[in-house]
Amino acid sequence: MKNKLKKKKNPKGTKKIKAKAKAHKVGTTKVKVKKKIYTIGTLHDLPSQIESYSDKESYSDKESYSDKESYSDKESYSDKESYSDKNILVKIFYEPEIRYLTPLEIETKPENKYCFFKKNNIKYIDFKNPSFLMKFLNERGEILPRRITGTSKKFQKKLKRAIKKCKHIGLLPYLTDGLR
């Protein structure tokens, strides 16, 4: 049996391709599957003014539209489709190694967050030490969330309370242009 596809032209203008019936093994017996018919779409001959260049030829090397025969003698392809009088240049251009618009997919492993206070066995957060508390503030003076600092819920509450006390006393500013 040949593995070639049979091509048939449908009178409606669509191209149908019949694929060879494939046999799948089920246990020790072979089961035949019905042939699949793929519809490819409407078949219209492209006008000769559309040229495809896969090699690097310049546009000026080709003939101009005035040298070619006009399309008024030929039948129209469809009422919906219209072609302009200018030459259309279609280039096949694909370089998979250059990707300008899409970002590169870099797979990075997220760092394991750990509670700084549990690791160093700190039970009490001193509110009188603003240089230590500044590590848990962003540049505008806001408290960093747990997902960034990696602290546990218990110590995040203690940290919040210590920072608020430090700001209330006046050791840390409430609002800043640039804390760091």
From Swiss-Prot:
One of its GO terms (molecular function) is structural constituent of ribosome. One of its GO terms (cellular component) is cytosolic small ribosomal subunit. The keyword Nucleotidyltransferase does not apply. Residues 1-26, 53-82 are annotated as: Disordered. Pfam families: Ribosomal_S18. Gene3D superfamilies: Ribosomal protein S18 (4.10.640.10). Disulfide bonds: none annotated. Keywords: Ribonucleoprotein, Ribosomal protein, RNA-binding, rRNA-binding. It comes from the Bacteria. GO terms for biological process: translation. Belongs to the bacterial ribosomal protein bS18 family. Part of the 30S ribosomal subunit. Forms a tight heterodimer with protein bS6. Binds as a heterodimer with protein bS6 to the central domain of the 16S rRNA, where it helps stabilize the platform of the 30S subunit. This is Small ribosomal subunit protein bS18.
